[in-house]
UniProtKB/Swiss-Prot annotation:
Keywords: NAD, Oxidoreductase
Catalysed conversion reaction: a primary alcohol + NAD(+) = an aldehyde + NADH + H(+); a secondary alcohol + NAD(+) = a ketone + NADH + H(+)
Self-association state and partner proteins as the record states: Homodimer.
Active-site residue numbers: Y150
One annotated GO molecular function: alcohol dehydrogenase (NAD+) activity
Protein name: Alcohol dehydrogenase 1
Binding site for NAD(+): 9-33
InterPro entries reported for this sequence: ADH_Ceratitis-type (IPR002426), NAD(P)-bd_dom_sf (IPR036291), Sc_DH/Rdtase_CS (IPR020904), SDR_fam (IPR002347)
Amino-acid positions noted as binding substrate in the UniProt annotation, renumbered to this chain: S137
Keyword Transmembrane: no
Species in which this protein is naturally found: Ceratitis cosyra
Length: 257
């Protein structure tokens, strides 16, 4: 799918991976890019505008934990440009001692944003179809013992996204739902990580993981932009060590009819 002439909403678009993806996407001649973020970085937004002046860039201060804020922010997009073609859910934190905050941002906020956006994008309702990319993690595919709460939130994203990626929904809505899983990437998520583990005695295994090889956010962001353009409904992609790989999940159970 070409994103030229399309309207993109990027939640968490000023984070490291998100911002790099936005920098790539804006070179594709988008009609508009809506950057939703709790962070306020006017210089970063201005830099995006300068990359491609043909694309209109909007910044919205966004609280993903507020259903009212989600509803109003997406309604503002429709009021400005009529359609949402691409939604990227990229907000995320690592802070296992604060269970509610972690789940509210990483999972519940993502779910609420997706459910609010779908009727606006649905080709049989107010929209013209499109693609939703939910950012999970490799720790949404494999256990993450040092950060069990973070891991649980990302497993939740995985289950939610794969469920919405069922062909039945795509046939009705025209919205592809894709899951993107970054591997270890050099971002501030790792800052002060020793205070963010599940237990005090998680530190030993956590520090081993924290000192393993990472990739640059520029590489991961470029992979994310590529996944958006693929519009591969129901798919799962891993970006790890500079390589983008499509995942074929194991099937452990199927209903008997």
């Amino acid at each position: 799918m070409s994103v030229a002439g399309k309207n993109v909403v990027f939640v968490g678009g000023l984070g490291f991976i998100g911002y790099e993806a936005c920098k790539t996407l804006i070179t594709r001649d988008l009609a508009s890019l809506f950057v939703f973020d709790i962070l306020d970085k006017p210089e970063a937004v201005k830099a995006l505008e300068e990359i491609n002046p043909k694309t209109k860039v909007y910044y919205t201060k966004f609280d993903i934990t507020s259903k009212d804020n989600i509803k109003q922010s997406l309604a503002d997009v429709i009021a400005k440009v009529q359609y949402i073609d691409v939604l990227v859910n990229g907000a995320g934190i690592l802070n296992d001692p604060n269970v509610e905050w972690t789940m509210n941002i990483n999972l519940i906020g993502l779910i609420n944003t997706t459910l609010e956006a779908i009727p606006l994008m649905d080709k049989n309702k107010k929209g013209r179809g499109g693609v939703i990319v939910n950012i999970a993690s490799v720790l949404g595919l494999e256990p993450g013992p040092p950060a069990a709460i973070y891991c649980a939130s990302k497993f939740g994203v995985m289950g939610f996204s794969r469920s919405l990626g069922d062909p039945h929904y795509y046939e009705h809505t025209g919205i592809a739902v894709v899951t993107f899983c970054p591997g270890l990437t050099d971002t501030p998520l790792k800052n002060n990580v020793a205070t963010k583990y599940t237990f005090d005695y998680s530190k030993e295994i956590g520090e081993k993981l924290n000192h393993s090889k990472t990739q640059k956010p520029e590489v991961c962001g470029a992979h994310l932009a590529q996944v958006i353009e693929l519009r591969d409904n129901g798919a799962i992609y891993i970006s790890n060590q500079g390589t983008l790989t499509k995942v074929k999940p194991s099937v452990y159970w199927e209903p008997t009819y």
